[in-house]
């Protein structure tokens, strides 16, 4: 495992320090989100998200982050959202009710606002959840919150790295990986490595952090080889 990891170090560094990982940014924000964001457009002009997120969920998370920073409510909103996610896990009927498209928008909105009041959520949290409820986006809440947590972690200098392997990394190899990541990401950042076991990758590893993915799995290499072998060969050009 260590040899497979070391053989990919130089390639890993190349990928990690560039923007070569494919990403597509949405050309337009959800209209209601734009309205939410422009409420304080002049005061948020100097706030930048610590990492660029893509997709509709990333846009929601980014605008909430900007609003939270300007209102000095980042920690409170983070806590509120974590509590809401936990509440939906422990009360699945309520969660299903808030996401059910057949529930009238006004009823769904009233339920969310009442829940926010009872939980004593901050006003920005309440407004944001109400926005999602009004536009039928509560079904995306878990994904949005995960994106938002990426931003808050980056804001604090924390970098979460997900490493997928067939078997758990031995301590020595995890230490080597962490040291390599620290060198790439830079001093002053706190790196947290989370390991995920997935036998379907056959071997090697997949490293994901800060919107970057380095796939050094045997599964992917085998798929690439299969595609290469399936391509027709033009013997005239040999």
Curated annotation (Swiss-Prot):
Task: State one molecular function term (GO).
Answer: proton-transporting ATP synthase activity, rotational mechanism
Main localization category: mitochondrion
Q: Which GO terms describe its cellular component?
A: chloroplast; mitochondrial inner membrane; mitochondrion; plastid
What keywords sit in the KW lines?
ATP synthesis, Hydrogen ion transport, Ion transport, Membrane, Mitochondrion, Mitochondrion inner membrane, Phosphoprotein, Transit peptide, Transport
Q: Which InterPro entries match?
A: ATP_synth_OSCP/delta_N_sf, ATPase_OSCP/dsu
Residues with PTM Phosphothreonine: 90
In the UniProt record, the transit peptide is located at 1-36
Compartment list: Mitochondrion; Mitochondrion inner membrane
Superkingdom assignment: Eukaryota
The keyword Nucleus appears for this protein: no
Q: Hey, which family's this protein in?
A: Belongs to the ATPase delta chain family.
Q: How does it assemble?
A: F-type ATPases have 2 components, CF(1) - the catalytic core - and CF(0) - the membrane proton channel. CF(1) has five subunits: alpha(3), beta(3), gamma(1), delta(1), epsilon(1). CF(0) has three main subunits: a, b and c.
Q: State what this protein does.
A: Mitochondrial membrane ATP synthase (F(1)F(0) ATP synthase or Complex V) produces ATP from ADP in the presence of a proton gradient across the membrane which is generated by electron transport complexes of the respiratory chain. F-type ATPases consist of two structural domains, F(1) - containing the extramembraneous catalytic core and F(0) - containing the membrane proton channel, linked together by a central stalk and a peripheral stalk. During catalysis, ATP synthesis in the catalytic domain of F(1) is coupled via a rotary mechanism of the central stalk subunits to proton translocation.
Q: What is this protein called?
A: ATP synthase subunit O, mitochondrial
- Annotated organism of origin: Arabidopsis thaliana (Mouse-ear cress)
């Amino acid at each position: 495992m260590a040899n497979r990891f070391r053989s990919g170090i130089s390639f890993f560094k190349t990928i990690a320090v560039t923007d070569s990982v494919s990403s597509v940014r949405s050309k337009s924000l959800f209209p209601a989100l734009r309205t939410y964001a422009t409420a304080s457009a002049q005061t948020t002009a100097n706030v930048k998200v610590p990492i660029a997120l893509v997709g509709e969920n990333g846009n929601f998370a980014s605008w909430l982050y900007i609003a939270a920073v300007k209102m000095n409510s980042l920690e409170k909103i983070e806590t509120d959202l974590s509590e809401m996610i936990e509440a939906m896990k422990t009360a699945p009927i309520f969660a299903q009710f808030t996401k059910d498209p057949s529930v009238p928008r006004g009823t769904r909105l009233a339920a969310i606002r009442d829940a926010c009041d009872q939980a004593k959520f901050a006003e920005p949290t309440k407004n944001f959840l109400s926005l999602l409820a009004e536009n039928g986006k509560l079904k995306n809440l878990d994904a949005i919150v995960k994106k938002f947590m990426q931003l808050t972690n980056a804001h604090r200098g924390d970098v979460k790295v997900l490493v997928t392997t067939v078997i758990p990394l031995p301590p020595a190899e995890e230490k080597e990986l962490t040291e390599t990541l620290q060198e790439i990401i830079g001093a002053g950042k706190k790196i947290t490595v989370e390991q995920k076991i997935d036998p379907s990758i056959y071997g090697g590893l997949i490293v994901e952090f800060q919107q970057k993915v380095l796939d050094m799995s045997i599964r992917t290499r085998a798929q690439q080889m299969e595609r290469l072998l399936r391509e027709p060969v033009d013997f005239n050009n040999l």
